[in-house]
Amino acid sequence: MSGPLEGADGGGDPRPGEPFCPGGVPSPGAPQHRPCPGPSLADDTDANSNGSSGNESNGHESRGASQRSSHSSSSGNGKDSALLETTESSKSTNSQSPSPPSSSIAYSLLSASSEQDNPSTSGCSSEQSARARTQKELMTALRELKLRLPPERRGKGRSGTLATLQYALACVKQVQANQEYYQQWSLEEGEPCAMDMSTYTLEELEHITSEYTLRNQDTFSVAVSFLTGRIVYISEQAGVLLRCKRDVFRGARFSELLAPQDVGVFYGSTTPSRLPTWGTGTSAGSGLKDFTQEKSVFCRIRGGPDRDPGPRYQPFRLTPYVTKIRVSDGAPAQPCCLLIAERIHSGYEAPRIPPDKRIFTTRHTPSCLFQDVDERAAPLLGYLPQDLLGAPVLLFLHPEDRPLMLAIHKKILQLAGQPFDHSPIRFCARNGEYVTMDTSWAGFVHPWSRKVAFVLGRHKVRTAPLNEDVFTPPVPSPAPSLDSDIQELSEQIHRLLLQPVHSSSTTGLCGVGPLMSPGPLHSPGSSSDSNGGDAEGPGPPAPVTFQQICKDVHLVKHQGQQLFIESRAKPPPRPRLLATGTFKAKVLPCQSPNPELEVAPAPDQASLALAPEEPERKESSGCSYQQINCLDSILRYLESCNIPNTTKRKCASSSCTASSASDDDKQRAGPVPVGAKKDTSSAVLSGEGATPRKEPVVGGTLSPLALANKAESVVSVTSQCSFSSTIVHVGDKKPPESDIIMMEDLPGLAPGPAPSPAPSPTVAPDPAPDAYRPVGLTKAVLSLHTQKEEQAFLSRFRDLGRLRGLDTSSVAPSAPGCHHGPIPSGRRHHCRSKAKRSRHHQTPRPETPCYVSHPSPVPSSGPWPPPPATTPFPAVVQPYPLPVFSPRGGPQPLPPAPTSVSPATFPSPLVTPMVALVLPNYLFPSPTSYPYGVSQAPVEGPPTPASHSPSPSLPPPPPSPPHRPDSPLFNSRCSSPLQLNLLQLEESPRTEGGAAAGGPGSSAGPLPPSEESAEPEPRLVEVTESSNQDALSGSSDLLELLLQEDSRSGTGSAASGSLGSGLGSGSGSGSHEGGSTSASITRSSQSSHTSKYFGSIDSSEAEAGAAQARTEPGDQVIKYVLQDPIWLLMANADQHVMMTYQVPSRDAASVLKQDRERLRAMQKQQPRFSEDQRRELGAVHSWVRKGQLPQALDVTACVDCGSSVQDPGHSDDPLFSELDGLGLEPMEEGGGEGGGVGGGGGGVGGGGGDGGEEAQTQIGTKGSSSQDSAMEEEEQGGSSSSPALPAEENGTS
């Protein structure tokens, strides 16, 4: 219809006296869009009426009207169509033209008459009679169309003819749309006949469905073919309900019976593949049960006899099924959609919905658009769900109640989504009257963005409308429009809900993390079951959950270590550990709850909180599906972020690896009475806080959640978090898991401070699956799938534990030497600052004081000789000599230990391989067996390089090179293993610089002559070789290659700074660098038992012992002995356990060759400039012509300590000419930084003697070293006097 009616008359009206040729005139604009003079033709002047009856147009206006009608197609001014007006005006008065032009246009364009032939003359009587006949037929058709115009379309001030034509056009479009929908419906599903379903004849189908229709007189059944879209069967009740004969429906398209706006909803809800199959032998009872469970679709179906003035639509609830129907005996069965249609009555008419059942729920977006409407709203409001979806909420509220919505949303924000009741509001029903409803509201706070994602409303009708038939069409009135106040109010609410939610209540954040609102959010806020009681005040603290641990990890990774520490320090001090083991966490406004912070909740608080807590949790109904789904996906994401590492790090305090562990214990737990200060590791690990966990939600002696009791090392959390996504090697995966295995066993340990062997490690893991019973989500809510995932998550650790072959002999509580007793507050600052540094690529910030002495409450004892290699897991990482001495005390004799392995004077720390718990050397010098300030004698075992007077009386801990490579845990800058090659290239120049720092002595101590500092190096090499014969030697051959790569990559981390980095080792200088490093580098590659591939504790080596020995006690910080990483045991594991790249040792030449090949391969991926581009850039930037970095960037000075060591330049160095081609430049962030506070890797004092100077020399000149020379030197332990390393002033000290 639109086709022939659209267009414009290109030629305008014919000039007077000229014959008009309708055949050559293009189609004029659609009649409904014509501007026309005179009033509307709503009174419908008949075609035969003469003059201007009902039409005020004069004769002289006909031509102007014709012109406007032919030249204007877009002005729909609500008047009648120009076609009819010009037709009548031309009949009433003679126009200047012999033939009425507008009549010609009308006849030629709107009628299917035969006058498309050009008329011979304008006054032919036969032609005029034909036109009059066509015009009469046209008016008759229009009159009939107007009878079928729906009442709601007959608005005031609108032309009846225009509205009729517009409605006819809409109907045509709807028919076309129906066909398109149907084609999509049938094509999407492929061949429906392939579905396995029962086949019914029409008689069988009628017999089955009659049980429904007899039970409910407002129900009928209809079957629609999926192949043709036509009705193949309809029950007799359809004619009664729709007030028409049953035969009218046979063969008709079902979509043509639906209201146009419901056709898409119907097709979208009846996709064949998603429909339930109509079961064989479905009885009325069973079928009705299925019917109530199936997803229904609401549609309006046209009814009423043809003679009615317009179609009347009645609302029905359609429940679709899929089945096969055989129309006749010989015809094949065809798949059909069987619909059970139930008419919907107004809830206020008989049969009425009881007043206490007039409840429905809604959900709307922060911008106040309906997102979901409960189907129970249909009989109460008169709207079908699809009528409200996407519509503004405020549009349906009484104008006086709209401002209340702003207050409602403010309260939602204040209560963090908690359900609450609100005063009644008036909602406009479909019939135009208002329904008064009691409302309750709740908001869902997105756990990720902490913003209100959507608002849930629960509404109970209090007052019914005066007109109880809510489905009655409203009195014709202008369509509701968005008033300016509605728009403004919606914007205010939207801006309000853009704010993140802050709540001090654990249960305040509806759905954030595991702590979710106890209110029933799928039916929120009823006055009886979810009033604001819980929301108003902070709820009781919730038990620690695994999900909270995940959130802690996320917090640390993304918000920084300092914020993490501060959030942990906020809870009030708790006097002692509770035997109940209930550790509650309170959600801070922006921080996640930290279980381990509140290791010792006060008994009164815990007991008071626990009593009401459990009943509430049991009573609380689960949150909505959207909440659970959102949470589960987030938790799965967090679990994928290497959760084993994070969980492992919760055990920091037990590992005696870093003083920060116990520091943070003190810092977080607050002042702990001395009486309660049994060895923290003993108390925690022995299960004092973990074993007796009786909470029904968390479960008994579940171990991984027991980890929440452990104070963690802040540095460990930070470093591991920052590195967990980059480590890809065996060590970074396995040690965390095995650590957790060990922790699973810990709850079985006997309580008490005294060391006692723990029971077999296989005792505790069994309850572990209960550990992950969701605390916040409640058992009733979490899906079985999630529980299985969590159990599998734990089972991996248990399996690994069996692989490790743990036995009880190795699991011993921490000895007194672990320094878990009271620790002065001074040390806490180091934990914090150190944690912060290790967070930011572990570049030391010397501005943070690093000299506070921390007295150790533990009496001095002999060092810890490494336990046998067969020791079960906790002792797998051989303990290094523990610095057991008073911080400022004088030398204390240490009992000589034989070179062979001897039982540990101190029991092995339980969680020794906490690889991430490393404290950077610049904060805590590597532990030594000697008290501070006491010179160490070289030992047969790997001696600490700082020893001045050789004495073979010390036990043989594996020697730690003074310049050993930094642990990537603290300085990894690679985001994927593919970037390790690039990282090594960047790091290699830096690794040359700080090895002199490996020079003995921490900077605070007296600097011995350079000869003394260089002397021990050859011995160290020999000692290393001899030490390889001990329990540690099993892995030395295998790891030699890895350590060589360590030495090459020199991922200088503050934690693994070189020996001399003592208190000041920087990220750059931490690598093996230094004058007396030739032997040391060899040691580092041969005897160091840590590797960047395993995320080990580089600073755990005894390398820094000498640094401590030389440092004045006042400038030292006690550093716990760090043990070897767990991969030592892995070296003895089966070959298939190891990664493929752990091949037999390779020589340096092959390694360098492979590196160069990788660089060449990477070179192809570097951007290249054409010569023109180079010239153009060179004209602007001179450094482009030289192929060097700009002067502003080419700086090797220590950023943190302010040293001015500058790069002498490398314009002539072949390495950098090659780098120019690659587009690479060595990372020079660590320039003089290696010294940290003390300067170039020389510890606080700038390195020991010449060692310190050479450290500075190499730091300052690393930029100018040849890459090959640097790599070869690092691989082969090249001497520090490499010609590629010119000397420089020791300016960093």
Swiss-Prot record:
Residue ranges of the motif Nuclear localization signal: 823-839
Region annotation (Interaction with BTRC) ranges: 1-151
Motif range (Nuclear export signal 3): 978-985
Residues recorded with modification Phosphoserine: 122, 126, 660, 662, 703, 814, 975-976
Cell location: Nucleus; Cytoplasm
Stored SUPFAM superfamilies: PYP-like sensor domain (PAS domain)
Tissues in which the UniProt entry reports expression: Expressed in pancreas. In the CNS, highly expressed in the SCN, internal granular layer of granular cells of the olfactory bulb, tuberculum olfactorium, piriform cortex, gyrus dentatus of the hippocampus, cerebellum, pars tuberalis/median eminence, and pituitary, and moderately in the tenia tecta, caudate putamen, accumbens nucleus, spinal cord, superior and inferior colliculus and pineal gland.
Domain of life: Eukaryota
List of residues that carry Phosphothreonine: 121
Induction behaviour: In pancreas, expression exhibits a circadian rhythm in the presence of light/dark cycles.
Segments forming domain PAS: 208-275, 348-414
Protein name per the record: Period circadian protein homolog 1
Record gene name: Per1
